[in-house]
């Protein structure tokens, strides 16, 4: 992974940083607490969504971020492809957004993942390592630059195990292995139980015995099938005889029923003759009925027209009485209308004279409303700013108190800091070395000093932040005081303007009162106009009513004349219809007397349906004749009842079929048992094979468990293989960086790593500061590449401030050789003198890059 660019906003101590990485060495320099060490954490968080210090992602947001949001943009190259990651962490809303894209050759971006979890998974696929391995290989923390180089063999084994075999990973692996073995134990136990059950089943069900029993059952079934076939033939013969007997009985019964029906039909034929004669008179009866209905309809119409004639005469009389009343109301409305018009003219003159004053009053009231709103706004703004000023004063006092406590705490820590710096310088000196501080010769043993430098830098950073906060609060306080004074002046000016406008409005209202204007003048005008319109509408309506009444009387007179003619014509028609109907009734009753039927009997007969009983009688007599002939033929064959013989044979057949069915079920059960026995024999062989395979697998896993978690065996073997790969890479780096001067090897008996200087062995602790740093970095990079593949970037957090100027220059000149590796190498230091030795450097102060 080769970093290209990192943009950071409000992440830990970094407020606003934009860095472009280049091949070679870059030195990041700045005071303690400036945010230098946060650069690597920003890269780690951008890639994996995890830092190093805190488990909670929202703790990485800078506490002074106004919007509570941290933003990271990281561009890098891997395997010939370029990628970009964008992450935003909002601590206020508890939101974490992430997006991973590939940067294409045309500059466009193709999205790969858009959620924190999926981005982390895709990054792990691209880099081929997880977060834990990344932070243990790509980053060399403060104070550990030569830890691996000078450690004894036991510690080297622990360091390698920590990188490649974390305790958590081994515990997880051991747990999985135990679960797998437990699962295998359960499966083997289940299979063994199944094996025992199958073996028991095969012992209980002997295959040869089952086959012999099946043969006996099949032979017996064959005999019974033959016997059933003979009985079925006998049953068929008896069935035919029984059917003939039943046919004879059935025909005799049918003959008896038909004889009775023939007697009934003979009576029905006589009755139907009367019905037919009655139906011949039905058309005449219908005509009389229709003539009667027509006569009644005409009578009703005549009564209706006579009634309508009387109604029209009454309606004409009522309308004639309404017309004089309408004319009197019309005259009164004309008088009222003239009076309202005079009142309306007077009110319109007053309104016309008042209109200029009214328009002026409206404009003044609008200005008054606008000024009142502005006045209220200014008063509200003043109160708001006064509250804000009180809040700032409170915050200022709290910040001062916090700063005083912090300064007291820092004063105590600074004394321990000086002791710790002295210890750091002394611990790097050997017996007889020149002290870089006093220039004297170093003698004696170094006494260890414990000091939490991270806590000291954190408190110092907090002090700087509190001082900046106090300055900001003072400026804001001054600005608010000035703003409140301006608001007070504007409020006084607003009061004067409001009073002036209210006086002008009062004078205009006095003048309007003098003219006779009142606030409801326009309402009175509208009311008068509405009354006038209402009177005009009523006058128009009454005029229309008078005209309509005259027209209505004329129409009624025409209708009366027309209805009178209709009444006379209908009376003449009714007289003619009565004479014709009397003649038809006389003819009808004469014909009824001739055929010997009374009127009531006629009404019953005419409703009857003619069923043609005479035709049915012929059919019945024909069927009786045919049945008598058929019965003679059957009686000549001596047909008898064989139902008892038939039932006896059927019962024998049913019993035989049941026995055959029982044998078939037994035959099926035996076939199933034989198939099941054969299947279980095959299953038994398969189980024997599977049990052997699973037992072998269990033994292999048990062997793996014994060797994998035995530190005396596996760890020594694993460390040896890793060291072979690490030393091979380190030798190659040293050959390039020192032109073949230095070589490195590992000897467990000689206490760890052995350095060869032009072939002469030297202990690692005997190297100069620059030589040791160069070899340590080469060794650390080699270990990182073995763990994570090809390594194109390396970050080193190491201070060299304890060295004098000459030693710093020596170390810097040696470390410059790392430029030849064509990698991105970043040194993080708070020593400006050390950083000046390098061409490319960044200075970070207060969380921002101040120069490049």
From Swiss-Prot:
Question: What result is annotated for mutating residue 115 to E?
Answer: Strongly decreased DNA-binding
Its EC number is 3.6.-.-
Which residues are recorded as binding Mg(2+)?
37, 142, 797
Keyword Coiled coil in annotation:
yes
Top-rank taxon: Bacteria
Q: Does the keyword Zinc apply?
A: yes
Q: Which GO terms describe its molecular function?
A: ATP binding; ATP hydrolysis activity; DNA binding; DNA exonuclease activity; metal ion binding
Q: Which UniProt keywords apply?
A: ATP-binding, Coiled coil, DNA damage, DNA repair, Hydrolase, Metal-binding, Nucleotide-binding, Zinc
The protein here is known as: DNA double-strand break repair Rad50 ATPase
Q: How is the cofactor bound?
A: Binds 1 zinc ion per homodimer.
Question: Could you say which protein family the record assigns here?
Answer: Belongs to the SMC family. RAD50 subfamily.
- Describe the location of the Zinc-hook domain by residue ranges: 389-488
Q: Name one GO biological process term.
A: double-strand break repair
Q: Which InterPro entries match?
A: Helix_hairpin_bin_sf, P-loop_NTPase, Rad50/SbcC_AAA, Zn_hook_RAD50
**Protein's organism:** Thermotoga maritima (strain ATCC 43589 / DSM 3109 / JCM 10099 / NBRC 100826 / MSB8)
Write out the residues that bind ATP.
32-38, 53-54, 59, 61, 63
User: What residues does Zn(2+) bind to?
Assistant: 435, 438
User: Where does this protein have coiled-coil stretches?
Assistant: 155-345, 389-427, 460-488, 534-711
EC primary class: hydrolase
The uppermost taxa in this organism's lineage are: Bacteria, Thermotogati, Thermotogota, Thermotogae, Thermotogales
Q: What is known of its domains?
A: The two conserved Cys that bind zinc constitute the zinc-hook, which separates the large intramolecular coiled coil regions. The 2 Cys residues coordinate one molecule of zinc with the help of the 2 Cys residues of the zinc-hook of another Rad50 molecule, thereby forming a V-shaped homodimer.
């Amino acid at each position: 992974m080769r970093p290209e660019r990192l943009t950071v906003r409000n992440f830990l101590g970094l407020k606003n940083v934009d860095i472009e990485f280049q091949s070679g060495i870059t030195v990041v320099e700045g005071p303690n607490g400036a945010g230098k060490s946060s650069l690597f954490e920003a890269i780690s968080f951008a890639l994996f969504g995890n830092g190093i210090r805190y488990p909670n992602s929202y703790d990485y947001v800078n506490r002074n971020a106004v919007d509570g949001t941290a933003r990271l943009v990281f561009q890098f190259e891997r395997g010939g492809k370029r990628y970009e990651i964008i992450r935003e962490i909002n601590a206020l809303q508890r939101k974490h957004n992430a997006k991973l894209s590939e940067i294409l050759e045309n500059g466009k971006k193709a999205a790969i993942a858009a959620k924190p979890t999926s981005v982390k998974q895709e990054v792990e696929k691209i880099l081929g390592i997880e977060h834990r391995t990344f932070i243990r290989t790509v980053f060399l923390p403060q104070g550990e630059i030569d830890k691996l180089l000078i450690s004894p063999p036991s510690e080297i084994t622990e360091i390698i195990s920590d990188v490649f075999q974390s305790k958590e990973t081994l515990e997880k692996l051991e747990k999985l292995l135990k679960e797998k073995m437990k699962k295998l134990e359960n499966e083997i136990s289940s299979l063994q139980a199944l094996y025992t059950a199958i073996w028991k089943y095969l012992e209980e069900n002997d295959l040869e015995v089952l086959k012999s029993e099946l043969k006996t059952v099949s032979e017996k079934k064959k005999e019974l099938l033959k016997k059933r076939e003979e009985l079925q033939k006998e049953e068929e013969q008896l069935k035919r005889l029984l059917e003939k007997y039943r046919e004879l009985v059935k025909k005799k019964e049918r003959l008896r029923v038909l004889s009775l029906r023939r007697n009934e039909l003979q009576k029905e034929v006589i009755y139907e003759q009367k019905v037919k004669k009655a139906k011949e008179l039905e058309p005449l009866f219908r005509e009389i009925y229709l003539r009667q209905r027509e006569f009644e309809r005409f009578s009703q119409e005549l009564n209706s027209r006579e009634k309508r004639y009387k109604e029209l005469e009454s309606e004409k009389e009522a309308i004639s009485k309404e017309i004089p009343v309408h004319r009197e109301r019309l005259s009164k409305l004309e008088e009222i209308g003239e009076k309202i018009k005079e009142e309306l003219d007077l009110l319109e003159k007053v309104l016309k004279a008042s209109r200029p004053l009214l328009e002026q009053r409206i404009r003044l009231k609008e200005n008054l409303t606008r000024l009142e709103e502005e006045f209220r706004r200014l008063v509200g703004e003043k109160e708001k700013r006064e509250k804000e000023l009180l809040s700032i004063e409170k915050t200022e006092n709290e910040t001062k108190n916090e700063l005083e406590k912090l300064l007291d705490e820092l004063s105590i820590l600074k004394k321990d800091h000086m002791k710790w710096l002295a210890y750091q310088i002394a611990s790097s000196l050997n017996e007889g070395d020149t002290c870089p501080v006093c220039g004297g010769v170093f003698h004696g043993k170094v006494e260890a000093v414990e000091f939490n430098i991270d806590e000291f830098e954190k408190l110092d950073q907090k002090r700087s932040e509190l001082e900046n906060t106090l300055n900001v609060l003072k400026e804001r306080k001054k600005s608010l005081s000035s703003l409140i004074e301006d608001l007070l002046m504007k409020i006084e000016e607003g009061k004067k303007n409001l009073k002036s406008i209210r006086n002008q409005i009062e004078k205009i209202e006095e003048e309007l009162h003098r003219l006779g204007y009142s606030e409801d003048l326009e309402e009175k005008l509208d009311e008068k106009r509405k009354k006038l319109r209402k009177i005009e509408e009523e006058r128009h309506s009454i005029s229309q009513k008078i005209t309509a009444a005259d027209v209505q009387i004329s129409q009624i007179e025409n209708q009366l004349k027309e209805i009178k003619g209709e009444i006379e014509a209908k009376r003449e028609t009714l007289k003619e219809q009565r004479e014709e109907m009397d003649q038809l009734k006389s003819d009808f009753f004469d014909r009824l007397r001739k055929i010997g039927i009374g009127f009531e009997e006629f009404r019953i007969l005419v409703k009857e349906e003619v069923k043609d009983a005479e035709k049915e009688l012929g059919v019945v007599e024909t069927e009786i004749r045919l049945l008598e002939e058929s019965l003679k033929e059957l009686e000549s064959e001596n047909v008898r009842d064989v139902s008892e013989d038939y039932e006896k044979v059927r019962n024998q057949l049913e019993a035989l079929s049941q026995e055959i069915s029982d044998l078939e079920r037994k035959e099926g059960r035996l076939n199933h048992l034989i198939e099941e026995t054969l299947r279980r024999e095959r299953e038994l062989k398969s189980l024997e094979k599977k049990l052997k395979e699973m037992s072998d697998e269990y033994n292999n896993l048990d062997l793996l468990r014994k060797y994998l978690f035995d530190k005396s065996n596996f760890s020594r073997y694993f460390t040896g293989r890793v060291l072979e790969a690490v030393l091979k890479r380190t030798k190659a780096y040293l050959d390039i960086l020192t032109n073949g001067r230095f070589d490195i090897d590992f000897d467990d008996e000689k206490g760890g790593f052995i350095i060869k200087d032009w072939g002469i062995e030297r202990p690692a602790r005997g190297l100069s500061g620059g030589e040791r740093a160069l070899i340590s970095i080469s060794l650390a990079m080699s270990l990182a590449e073995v763990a994570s593949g090809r390594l194109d970037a390396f970050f080193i957090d190491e201070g060299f401030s304890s060295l004098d100027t000459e030693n710093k220059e020596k170390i810097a000149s040696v470390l410059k050789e790392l430029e030849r590796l064509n990698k991105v190498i970043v040194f993080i230091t708070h020593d400006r003198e050390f950083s000046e030795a390098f061409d490319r450097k960044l200075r970070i102060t207060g969380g921002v890059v101040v120069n490049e």
